[in-house]
Swiss-Prot record:
GO biological process entries: mRNA splicing, via spliceosome; spliceosomal complex assembly
HAT repeats: 52-84, 86-118, 120-152, 154-185, 187-218, 220-255, 257-291, 301-333, 335-369, 379-415, 417-448, 450-482, 484-518, 520-551, 569-607
Broad class of where this protein is predominantly found: nucleus
Organism of derivation: Emericella nidulans (strain FGSC A4 / ATCC 38163 / CBS 112.46 / NRRL 194 / M139)
Role summary: Involved in pre-mRNA splicing and cell cycle progression. Required for the spliceosome assembly and initiation of the DNA replication.
Assigned protein family: Belongs to the crooked-neck family.
Protein name according to UniProt: Pre-mRNA-splicing factor clf1
Pfam families (alphabetical): HAT_Syf1_CNRKL1_C, HAT_Syf1_CNRKL1_N
Keyword Nucleus appears in the UniProt entry: yes
Domain of life where this protein originates: Eukaryota
GO cellular component, one term: Prp19 complex
Gene3D superfamilies: Tetratricopeptide repeat domain (1.25.40.10)
PANTHER family per the UniProt record, alphabetical: CROOKED NECK-LIKE PROTEIN 1, PRE-MRNA SPLICING FACTOR
């Protein structure tokens, strides 16, 4: 019972010695198939028996066509049977009856015509074909049958007449090609040429013009080929141009080694066809230039290809200024001034839609590059000046301006040795839309011209317009210092540090201190540090103050040129500054600043101090400890804090004092009891 359950198991899984393929199985199945039944051959003993059989078959066929008149297969089987019986008149009658039912049945016409041709009834077949093409003039199969029969019979004029009747209906391209092939077979090239002329009028597709040109190339002259291509270009116009036509034309000229003609054809086509319709043309032109052109020709091909590419990108977005930059550089490389101007003029016409400066930043460089090209490359000074002028007119200066354009216009006038125009330009800029960059550019110009009085005037106007600009005060003072007018420089610094709205006052203070240091006015410098410390307790100020004190020479050292070691007085002054700073930070509990100060103090002692001084400062260095503090949401967080030994000692002394006071109070109370 257990062994009978489940699928049978294969004990021997090795392959059989004889393998049977699917092909072998199919072959055996076909070989063993039983033969189909065949109808017995009928034999008629006499004519009466034949007539009886024919009558019976005709009755069957008549019943078939009567029951289903529109089924042409019944009619055609009936007519075919009559043809087998050599009853041609009856067969014609059946075909005519069928045509009365459906005169548009092409298979019926074909069967009728072929039966007449098979029995060599040529005139009957010709009449049938004439009737058929008259009733169904758009059925090419009937026309092909007609011309084939006439040509087979050697009736070439009749064949031409049939073709002419057919061509009057303006059939498909295949019919015209068949007519042309007929004339070519009989060497009637003039007739074929005339047919091509009519053919290209009815079907003016470029491929048909190419067929005509190849015909002329084979049987005509090169002038006729050029005439065909020229007529094709003129007929098609720019709307229906095709790259294949120009490629074929150029290759024909290349065969004749007319390389300049071929190049002109390629360029003509590339200038007129859009990029999407001339990809293959570009490849063909590139290949042509590589084979037959020079280096300049190959570069022109690449330029033309990129030119079309940029045009396609600009069709998608005319305000893509990056594409305009690339396009302009491309034309500048080509060396055609008119093309360069055309691209720049088209580019600057794409004004940003909004009056927001971020939209104008890229656009304004088109004007700048245009003006520079006119000046440097085209050498057209008047046109460059006009470009700058038009650009400045276009910018909405009441909302924003571009100092770069004003400055470049002024520098352009300087290069033309027209200083008055340059000053007028910058003066107009400062009057319309003052900016720090404009002032700096104007001042740099006057400084290069050694017009220091004008520089002073400009600095005064800049400070009057924007007194919060620290750099303006510093540069003004440096100008006066460069002119050896230290009193004016010092007065400017004094005015600068007194300004309450400075954007970066620390720069002015530092410049003032460095100025006094360079002048050797150490007492003034010390006073400046003291005044600065009244305004701020920044740790860097204290550290720089201490470094200043260590570097200040004594009166005897000032007179000597040789360097001497740092005096004890200088070290004492520096330590005094460090100690003052340490007290300030300790009182204000500024731990981070205190640590930074102690690090600088320790570095100072390691460099200039004694071992006792170093040990003293090391004892003051803090240690980092981890502490916890409570947050607003009753949670705790850990943080790193600094613990200073001096603070611990003070706390310990205070704790000891309190403990002694408490003990004394207890003793006093016990004695009274």
């Amino acid at each position: 019972m257990e062994a009978s359950r489940g699928p049978p198991r294969v004990k021997n899984k090795a392959p059989a010695p004889v393998q049977i393929s699917a092909e072998q199985l199919l072959r055996e199945a076909v070989d063993r198939q039983e033969p189909s039944l065949q109808a017995p051959t009928q034999r008629f003993a006499d004519l009466e028996e034949l007539h009886e059989y024919q009558g019976r078959k005709r009755k069957e066929f008549e019943d078939y066509v009567r029951r289903n008149r529109i089924n042409m297969n019944n009619w055609m089987r009936y007519a075919a049977w009559e043809l087998e019986q050599k009853e041609f008149r009856r067969a014609r009658s059946i075909f005519e009856r069928a045509l009365d039912v459906d005169s548009t049945s092409v298979p019926l016409w074909i069967r009728y015509i072929e039966s007449e041709m098979r029995n060599r009834n040529i005139n009957h077949a010709r009449n049938l074909l004439d009737r058929a093409v008259t009733i169904l003039p758009r059925v090419d199969k009937l026309w092909y049958k007609y011309v084939y029969m006439e040509e087979t019979l050697g009736n070439i004029p009749g064949t031409r007449q049939v073709f002419e009747r057919w061509m009057s209906w303006e059939p498909d391209e295949g019919a015209w090609s068949a007519y042309i092939k007929l004339e070519k077979r009989y060497n009637e090239f003039e007739r074929a040429r005339a047919i091509f002329q009519r053919f290209t009028i009815v079907h003016p597709e470029p491929r048909n013009w190419i067929k005509w040109a190849r015909f002329e190339e084979e049987y005509g002259t090169s002038d006729l080929v050029r005439e065909v291509y020229g007529l094709a270009v003129e007929t098609l116009g720019e709307d229906f141009m095709d790259e294949k036509l120009f490629i074929a034309y150029a290759r024909f000229e290349t065969k004749l080694k007319e390389y300049e003609r071929a190049r002109a054809i390629y360029k003509y086509a590339l200038d007129r066809l859009p990029r999407s319709k001339s990809i293959t043309l570009h490849k063909a032109y590139t290949t042509f230039e590589k084979q037959f052109g020079d280096r300049e020709g190959v570069e022109n091909v690449i330029l033309a290809k990129r030119r079309v590419q940029y045009e396609e990108q600009l069709k998608e977005n005319l305000r893509n200024y990056d594409v305009w930059f690339d396009f302009a550089r491309l034309e500048e490389q080509s060396g055609d001034p008119e093309r360069v101007r055309d691209v720049y003029e088209r580019a600057i016409a794409q004004i940003p839609p909004s009056q927001e400066k971020r939209h104008w930043r890229r656009y304004i460089y088109l004007w700048i590059f245009y003006a520079l090209w006119e000046e440097m490359e085209a050498k057209d000074i008047d046109r460059a000046r006009q470009v700058y002028t038009e650009c400045l007119k276009l910018i909405p200066h009441k909302k924003f301006t571009f100092a770069k354009v004003w400055l470049m216009k002024a520098q352009f006038e300087v290069r033309q040795l027209n200083l008055q125009a340059a000053r007028k330009t910058l003066g107009q800029a400062i009057g319309m839309c003052p900016k720090d960059k404009l002032f700096r550019g104007y001042i740099d110009l006057e400084r290069q011209l050694f017009e220091f009085v004008r520089c002073r005037t400009l600095y005064e106007k800049q400070i009057e317009w924007n007194p919060s600009n620290s750099q303006s005060w510093i540069q003004y003072a440096e100008l006066e210092r460069g002119l050896d007018d230290t009193e004016r420089a010092r007065a400017i610094y004094e005015l600068g540090i007194d300004q309450p709205t400075l954007d970066m006052p620390e720069l002015v203070w530092k410049a003032y201190i460095d100025f006094e240091d360079d002048e050797g006015e150490y007492e003034r410098e010390r006073q400046l540090y003291e005044r600065l410390l009244q305004k701020t307790d920044h740790v860097k100020v204290w550290i720089n103050y201490a470094r200043f004190e260590i570097n200040v020479p004594d009166e005897e050292e000032e007179e000597e040129e040789e360097e001497r070691p740092i005096s004890d007085e200088a070290k004492r002054r520096a330590r005094a500054v460090f100690e003052r700073a340490h007290r300030v930070f300790k009182e204000k509990e500024l731990k981070e600043e205190r640590v930074e100060l102690l690090n600088a103090w320790r570095a100072f002692e390691h460099t200039h101090g004694s071992p006792e001084d170093i040990d003293k400062i090391e004892k003051q260095m803090p240690r980092r400890v981890k502490k916890r503090r409570k947050l607003d949401d009753d949670r705790y967080e850990e943080y790193m804090d600094y613990v200073f030994p001096a603070d611990d000692q003070s706390a310990a002394n205070l704790s000891k004092l309190l403990r002694m006071a408490h003990q004394w109070k207890q003793e006093t109370a016990g004695g009274q009891q």
